[in-house]
């Protein structure tokens, strides 16, 4: 039982935001057209508000785009689906990367993608089965985005380390090399976040392990994004996407010339600054869980 609780904590909390979400949200199939929510979009460098169309034009020019989400907000996934559908209309999409897919799933992703080129009639449950989709990511939230990316002509790539690697890092923490990504201020901010998410009930070796897992996930996402065909789009949790503590710092360590554009999907009332992202799209908070 104790081992099971530790594993649950590692998988669900080390990614800083993964949670069991309501299943009564986004429809699982990819729609032919998605209307996005009436939120507030801001250019964080100029402070100017943008329309969704203005944002789309700006994002279309990015060679590497990171979209940060709050995992349990259904409107964030609706926006992501809208981006997948509409960025492709502005220019060919080079690749899409998802935090929700791990390295070991890539062969299955490739097989399913090739199969879907034949446009078969297929149930969502069958796609989940073939992908070995992880139940921690509710299909009701992610099904539309995943199906859209699978049916698109561009590659769909994993952006997360395997579960066995998570367990190895927990037992023997090791950190990526780099000045920017492992700076004391960055690690202190991540530790503070991890402690807060555990209600203050984490310290010592367990905290070090959780920090190592988070930073190795960030490093892997950065490596995947840098090697992906461009224009590349990475969808991940907000902490991974953040310029101040996440993937962009690892990209700077690995390839200083690479400058990803970051769009943070947030909820009204959150404080998002230009240190964290280039653009922010505010929507209503996710309904409280019952």
Feature names for model-found ranges:
Residues 2-21:
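Gram-negative bacterial Sec-dependent N-terminal signal peptides
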Residues 21-290:
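Compositional signal for N-terminal targeting/processing segments
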């Amino acid at each position: 039982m104790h081992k099971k609780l530790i594993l649950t904590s590692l998988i669900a909390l080390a990614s800083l935001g993964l949670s069991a979400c309501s299943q009564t949200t986004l429809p699982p199939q990819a729609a032919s057209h998605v209307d996005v929510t009436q939120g507030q979009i801001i250019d964080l460098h100029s402070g100017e508000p943008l329309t969704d169309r203005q944002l789309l034009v700006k994002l279309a020019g990015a060679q590497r785009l990171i979209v940060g989400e709050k995992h349990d907000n259904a409107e964030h996934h609706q926006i992501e689906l809208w981006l997948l559908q509409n960025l492709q209309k502005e220019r060919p999409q080079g690749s899409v990367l998802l935090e929700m897919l791990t390295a070991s799933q890539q062969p299955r992703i490739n097989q399913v993608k090739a199969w879907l080129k034949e446009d078969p009639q297929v149930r969502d449950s069958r796609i989940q089965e073939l992908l070995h989709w992880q139940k921690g990511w509710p299909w009701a939230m992610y099904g539309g985005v995943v199906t859209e990316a699978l049916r698109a002509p561009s590659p769909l790539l994993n952006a997360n380390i395997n579960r066995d690697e998570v367990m190895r890092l927990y037992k023997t923490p090791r950190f990526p090399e780099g000045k920017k990504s492992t700076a004391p201020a960055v690690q202190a901010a991540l530790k503070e976040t991890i402690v807060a998410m555990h209600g203050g009930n984490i310290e010592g070796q367990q905290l070090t392990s959780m920090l190592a897992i988070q930073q190795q996930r960030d490093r892997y996402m950065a490596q995947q994004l840098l090697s992906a065909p461009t224009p590349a789009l990475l969808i991940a949790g907000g902490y991974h996407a953040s310029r101040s503590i996440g993937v962009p710092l690892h990209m700077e360590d690995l390839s200083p010339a690479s400058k990803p554009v970051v769009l943070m999907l947030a909820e009204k009332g959150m404080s998002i600054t230009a240190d964290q992202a280039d653009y922010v799209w505010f929507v209503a908070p996710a309904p409280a869980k019952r």
